[in-house]
């Protein structure tokens, strides 16, 4: 059985027969591109010439080239000259492409993803004017806020602070530098305040006395203040690319990383204001100590006048107790050794026993240590107790011993 070819089967199904290779028109009949410029299909080989541009000589030579030129001419969708360059694309296309590039860079998690997006997506001319208006509208609120607190804004701008989280992302903060510290405000809160301020300002412009009502409508701001009294140093200043990185070290030991464009020089301004604040505090401390010393000197003269009369009455009674102990030594000689001669008189009498050296002083004055020499014993006791009357008593003792002998 002979197999029918594919062309016959297609013709049986109702499809038209294929007449050589034919190219369809450029995609789905689209004749103009995104920016409005015409699409020109280019093929390899000699460029076909449209009928309107052909000369009679070209027409005579057409049969020599063959019938392929006809369908080539049919595929050309635009009748434009090649030497003319295509018109430049509008900026809208570039903006869309830049948006896609920025989203891709940020999605990959690159370090500079957010910066690239900020650089590529430039706002149009009208938007820049609106941003300036928003910035100018934000400054009065910051000024009023600082005036209420009694501070003066020395510098305002945007600083990027490294977050304390695990990812350590750079977050933009609206910073206000004052004479006493650095104020950090989240940008979202400022945007909300600006949005609430703008309708309030529109109603407040015709009538000036409604100013306090607008101030009362402003929501409270969540501020973070880095006071110079708690600030130790500004350290680790590094320049990488277009940014300057620096670290603020607090007295508690906490370190806060910041970065800013090199042209702004936030690190120099912060260090200068911190040094000036510390100098002012030192001068105030010296003045306060001097004032305290002056007050003490002024209070000292009345105190000396009160102290002087106090020692005078103390000096007068001092000689009186000195005079009283003078009669005391007079009664001291009163305890004279009057009872002592009584035992001596007892010793003066002769003992009835023939032995005169047998312990004559046991009863009145017992001696713990025995004397080796018995003869001088009575004389030593007599000299110790009563040296003035020892001689006559001694003679009596000698006489008594002689008589007994």
Curated annotation (Swiss-Prot):
SUPFAM superfamilies (UniProt xref): PH domain-like
Annotated segments matching region 11 X 2 AA repeats of P-H: 354-377
Signal peptide: none
Sequence ranges of Basic residues compositional bias: 350-376
Biased composition (Polar residues): 204-213
Function: Seems to be involved in regulation of apoptosis. May be involved in detachment-mediated programmed cell death. May mediate apoptosis during neuronal development. May be involved in regulation of anti-apoptotic effects of IGF1. Required for TCR-induced apoptosis and expression of TNFRSF6/FAS in a T-cell hybridoma cell line. May be involved in translational regulation.
GO terms classed as biological process: apoptotic process; positive regulation of apoptotic process
Induction notes from the record: Induced by IGF-I.
Keywords, ordered alphabetically: Apoptosis, Cytoplasm, Cytoplasmic vesicle, Nucleus, Repeat
Subcellular location: Cytoplasm; Cytoplasmic vesicle; Nucleus, Nucleolus
Full protein name: Pleckstrin homology-like domain family A member 1
């Amino acid at each position: 059985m002979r197999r029918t070819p594919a062309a016959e089967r297609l013709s049986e199904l109702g499809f038209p027969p294929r007449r050589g290779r034919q190219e369809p028109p450029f995609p789905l009949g689209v004749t103009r591109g995104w920016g409005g410029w015409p699409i020109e299909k280019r093929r390899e080989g000699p460029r076909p010439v449209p009928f309107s541009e052909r000369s009679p000589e070209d027409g005579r030579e057409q049969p020599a080239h063959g019938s392929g030129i006809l369908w080539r001419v049919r595929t050309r969708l635009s009748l434009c000259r090649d030497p003319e360059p295509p018109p430049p694309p509008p900026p809208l296309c570039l903006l869309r492409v830049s948006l896609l590039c920025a989203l891709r860079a940020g999605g990959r998690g690159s370090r500079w993803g957010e910066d690239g997006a900020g650089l590529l997506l430039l706002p149009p001319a009208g938007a820049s004017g609106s941003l300036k208006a928003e910035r100018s509208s934000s400054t009065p609120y910051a000024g009023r806020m600082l005036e209420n607190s009694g501070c003066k804004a020395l510098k305002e701008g945007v600083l990027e602070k490294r977050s304390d989280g695990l990812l350590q992302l750079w977050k933009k903060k609206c910073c206000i530098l004052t004479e006493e510290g650095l104020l950090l405000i989240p940008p979202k809160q400022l945007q909300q305040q600006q949005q609430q301020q703008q309708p309030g300002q529109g109603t407040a412009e015709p009538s000036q006395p409604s100013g306090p009502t607008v101030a009362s409508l402003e929501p409270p701001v969540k501020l973070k203040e880095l006071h110079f009294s708690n600030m130790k140093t500004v350290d680790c200043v590094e320049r990488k690319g277009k940014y300057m990185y620096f670290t603020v070290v607090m007295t508690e030991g906490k370190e806060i990383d910041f970065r800013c464009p090199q042209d702004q020089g936030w690190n120099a301004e912060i260090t200068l204001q911190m040094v000036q604040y510390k100098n002012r505090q030192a001068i105030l401390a010296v003045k306060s100590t001097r004032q305290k010393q002056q007050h003490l000197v002024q209070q000292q003269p009345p105190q000396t006048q009160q102290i002087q009369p106090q020692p005078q009455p103390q000096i007068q009674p001092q000689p009186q107790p000195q005079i009283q102990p003078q009669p005391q030594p007079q009664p001291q000689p009163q305890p004279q050794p009057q009872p002592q001669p009584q035992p001596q008189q007892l010793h003066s009498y002769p003992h009835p026993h023939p032995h005169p050296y047998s312990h004559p002083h046991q009863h009145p004055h017992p001696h713990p240590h025995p004397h080796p020499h018995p003869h001088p014993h009575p004389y030593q006791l007599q000299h110790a107790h009563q040296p003035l009357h020892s001689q006559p008593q001694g003679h009596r003792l000698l006489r008594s011993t002689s008589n007994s002998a």
